Amino acid sequence: MQYGFGAPVSGALSAPETLSRVATEGEAMGYDYITISDHVVIPRDIEARYPYSDTGEFPGRSRGDRHEQLTAVAFIAGATSRLRLVTSVTVVPHRPAVLQAKMLATIDVLSKGRLTFGIGAGWMKEEFEALGVPPFPARGAVTDEYLQACRELWTKDNPQFDGKYVKFANVLFEPKPVQKPHPPIWVGGESGPALRRTAALGDGWYPIGTNPQHRLDSMKRFAAGVERLRRLTREAGRDPAKIDLAYRVTNWGRSLPARADDGERRLFSGESADIVGDLRALRDIGVGHVDFNFGGDTADAMIAGMRRFREDLLSRV
């Protein structure tokens, strides 16, 4: 099993020297990948409901000071040599398909094949409006089409595409990504459309357990989600064994309720031994990647937390 940690791309810890230090020290500790989140702008007034809190309030709504995702990925790539770079997640409709494909291919080349393209369709209507991208209600269809266009550009010598939202022909697209056929595509999300997108277009499923509408916060619920994904993948004519499973953890420990609302044990609640048991259970069901958000008011505090977690918990899995 591989373990990742979140990059501080907003607030005081996102200063160049701090961001670089967190990334390089995480790499030196033996973490396998770093995740980088995506918001281009934060609207002052947000009516859209954030999918991963019970209240629907976005925890970062007061912070407009955050780096553009793919620029930050390139910066981290230059500071590290081994860490995989996971976009967590890229809101696919936010960037034109051809430009997005080029930026991602460039990152994969310059990082020597370390990019994982985590993707989502987006949830913040006001951000879509500010960016002037295709309409928010069409985000699912736009995401699917942009992904297909990216694959065309990454894999074909004479790429052509004639879709509703993107069209191109008569283009040379080089260099191609280092990874073949292209960087792995991890599909974020827990809903039916996200599962169908994973089954049809994804190389991995990358959910968060805390979506109130689609909770995956107990092993029973997560196992049911995995089984549904495998069924949809077979229906799409693909091999479920080729779909990687990842899991993103935003909170853990004694502060969490011990039980999910289905009556089962809540994943990542309780003591260290409980969390080690959860990681083993996820591994047994086929999960190959788990990542965590580490807080801290200073770089020293964040790095110390990462080190303790790795030594006290991850080393026991």
PLM regions: where:
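Active-site-adjacent structural elements that line small-molecule/cofactor binding pockets in enzymes
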Residues: M1-V317
